[in-house]
Amino acid sequence: MEIEKLNLYRDTNWNDIKLRFCGHSECLPLHSYGPGTRPYYLMHFVLSGKGRLVVNKTEYQITENQLFLVEPDQMVFYQADKEDPWTYSWVGFNGKLAPYFMHRLGFGYPSLTKELSTEVFEEIKDLLDILISIKNNNTKNDLYTNGILLLLLSKVGTFIEDSKELPERKSRQNSESHVQRAISIVEDFYGRDLTVQYIADKL
């Protein structure tokens, strides 16, 4: 029997970005959705197991510690694996700035999946647990749950941005190291005949 938890949040007047609902599913083998569309963004976080996502005839194999995004009005099909069905949590959200934020995070067909580190995934799981546990709809909780959504997206964005920057940062550090070494050689041999080839050989 599939185990599912669902938390719905009341509609608010916030138009920029707002949390609509969140949930958690321990899926049965081959449990599926679609082909169908959603009227909002739906971000899934795969906690264990695996499955597949099909969008525009492109198939993605999704495993633990990955997330996948369903965009509004996008025809999708996704299905749990037969042998190792996935367990995932999800958040549904919309708002006039939601497309902008998703684009800045690097999402958009065909880039609909991201792999996160175990550490970041654990932090996100804690935030999802909080969202699922909140039951009372009031102004205080409206602020709290929307704040958690923004924090969750921020953690995803920070990890993605850091991952992109690592090769660039490493290259920049190596370049700076070579520059400093070249300066040191020039200073050490100041007043002597130096050639570019000599400096290059010393680096």
Language model segments and positions:
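Generic protein-terminus/edge-of-domain signal
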Residues: M1-L67, Q74, K82, L105-S117
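Amphipathic, well-ordered alpha-helical segments in soluble domains
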Residues: K18, L42-F45, N94-L97, E123-L127, ...
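Short, Lys/Arg-enriched, Trp-marked, Pro/Gly-tolerant hinge/linker segments that flank
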Residues: Y109-E122, I134-N146, L153-L203
